[in-house]
């Protein structure tokens, strides 16, 4: 089991090193980016945020690269937090894929492929700065509403 974990960590380290070469990194992590954006899309769809556009492809945004984007027509205080933090749902998915990889022979093609997928999901689970902005805005509104309810209830 320790060998499996070491290989998974090495793959994650490789992804981290690839960040120096932005376009190569964007290409390598594209499957994870697709999973990240799909998580926003489907949670937004279920919660009525009305996804208006879906773009999993990287594009230049000033001096940086935006790996993907989903825009919503009805992102509100009550659905902003779950939509913004939807990529966190990829963490348990990553763990399940990593666990499944331990059933394959060590360093076999299927073992490495599953570990790469697990690393993709793990890297893709990190909310972006924009995701955090939406989550904080939604949380701020919830805090104000809770405080108002508390004060008015006294």
What are these regions (language model features)?
Residues 3-15, 58-154:
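Metalloprotease/metallohydrolase-associated module, dominated by Zn2+-dependent proteases
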Residues 19-76:
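Small-residue-rich helix-interface/hinge motifs
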